[in-house]
């Protein structure tokens, strides 16, 4: 494993030896010990948002998108309407989920380098009283842009609407307090800022809303109300759980708390991000976003203009030096992305910058 490249991606990401070793034990899915493991994971997750009084944590097999679809399908009534706020590819995915599920929706789209504002949402909700829910990406992974969640949440509450937050790339690293930020659902996953492995999503669902959602869901497997009710009654998952993923997440959460919890995780990622931004600027590579809206999760960089730069060649050369980067996901300009999360510190980020600089020299890329 020592020769494995460092994943500078937004997840899956580089995990610790302890987290990987936790997957070497096999668990019985109905066994009391595994049920206790699941309960412990949910309890620790709720503690991160101070949400135990107001929300249930409902785990779900699959990727984060599975959990997002389950949240929308379970909590938005068949006759509800969702306002989807979009400034990147994952906001577009929210709209696609609503379309596939047959939920009425409208969209509000801003440029990929422009956060949605609370004023935008205030105006949109005043103009369309039929909206019941607003769906928002907290940190839009296609760029790394951070949308102003607390301000938007307060506007939505003032209008008497309900908020669904895709916090896939922010949960565990950026502060979200359920006592201060009103939301009906917040969705995240095991393989992001918690530094577990992929395979389990989870939804923090407001207790009364979840109880009232019986019969809403479009799917048996993705019915969060039924999943929670069964877990509350039996302690078990309804269908085969990702036992090794849960065990790895439990171990990752122990390390999360040992590190110092959210403040320490946020600080490390912030240090990683600053090291990356400073180092790349010195070699002429500049970030797509201004600093004030850049989340310390993933950074989008403008690609060099030099025709000798080709991303596939660049990617393979950087990979050979021990780092896996991420392709750009923007429509208007050519970019590439570098993640700041995972089991890596500032020294690792500087090593990645050095590798990028060396590769660009090897490729004789001059026009950056």
Swiss-Prot record:
Presence of the UniProt keyword Transferase in the record: yes
Modified residues (N6-(pyridoxal phosphate)lysine): 192
Catalysed conversion reaction: (2-aminoethyl)phosphonate + pyruvate = phosphonoacetaldehyde + L-alanine
Transmembrane residue ranges: none
SUPFAM superfamilies reported for this sequence: PLP-dependent transferases (SSF53383)
Subunit structure: Homodimer.
Catalytic EC class: transferase
Naturally occurring in which organism (per UniProt): Pseudomonas entomophila (strain L48)
The gene coding this protein: phnW
One GO MF term: 2-aminoethylphosphonate-pyruvate transaminase activity
Gene3D superfamilies: Aspartate Aminotransferase, domain 1 (3.90.1150.10), Type I PLP-dependent aspartate aminotransferase-like (Major domain) (3.40.640.10)
Protein's name according to its UniProt entry: 2-aminoethylphosphonate--pyruvate transaminase
């Amino acid at each position: 494993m020592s020769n494995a490249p460092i994943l500078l991606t937004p997840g899956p990401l580089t995990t610790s030896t302890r987290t990987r070793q936790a997957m070497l034990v096999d668990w019985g899915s109905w066994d009391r010990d595994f049920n206790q493991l699941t309960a412990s994971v949910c309890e620790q997750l709720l503690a991160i948002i101070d949400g135990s009084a107001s929300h249930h944590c409902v785990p779900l097999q699959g990727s984060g998108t599975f959990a997002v679809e389950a949240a929308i399908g379970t909590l938005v009534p068949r006759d509800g309407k969702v306002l989807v706020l979009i400034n990147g590819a994952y906001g577009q995915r929210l709209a696609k989920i609503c379309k596939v599920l047959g939920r009425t929706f409208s969209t509000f789209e801003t440029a990929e380098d422009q956060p949605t504002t609370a004023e935008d949402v205030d105006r949109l909700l005043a103009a369309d009283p039929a909206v019941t829910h607003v769906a928002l990406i907290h940190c839009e992974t296609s760029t790394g842009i951070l949308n102003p969640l607390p301000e938007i949440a307060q506007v939505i509450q003032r209008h008497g609407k309900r908020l669904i937050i895709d916090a896939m790339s922010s949960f565990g690293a950026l502060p979200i307090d359920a006592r201060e930020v009103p939301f009906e659902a917040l969705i995240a996953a095991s393989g992001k800022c918690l530094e577990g492995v992929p395979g389990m999503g989870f939804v923090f669902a407001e207790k009364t809303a979840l109880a009232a959602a019986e019969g809403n869901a479009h799917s048996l497997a993705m019915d969060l109300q039924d999943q929670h009710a069964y877990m509350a009654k039996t302690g078990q998952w309804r269908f085969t759980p990702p036992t090794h993923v849960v065990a790895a997440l439990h171990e990752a959460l122990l390390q999360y708390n040992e590190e110092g919890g959210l403040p320490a995780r946020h600080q490390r990622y912030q240090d990683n991000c600053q090291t990356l931004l400073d180092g790349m600027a010195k070699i002429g590579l500049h970030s797509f976003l201004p600093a004030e809206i850049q989340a310390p999760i993933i950074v989008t960089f403008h690609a060099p203009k030099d025709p000798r730069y080709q991303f596939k060649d660049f990617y393979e050369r950087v990979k050979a030096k021990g780092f896996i980067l991420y392709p750009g996901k923007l429509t208007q300009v050519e970019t590439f992305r570098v993640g700041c999360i995972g089991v890596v510190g500032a020294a690792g980020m500087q090593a990645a910058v050095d590798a990028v600089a060396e590769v660009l020299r090897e490729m004789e890329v001059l026009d950056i």
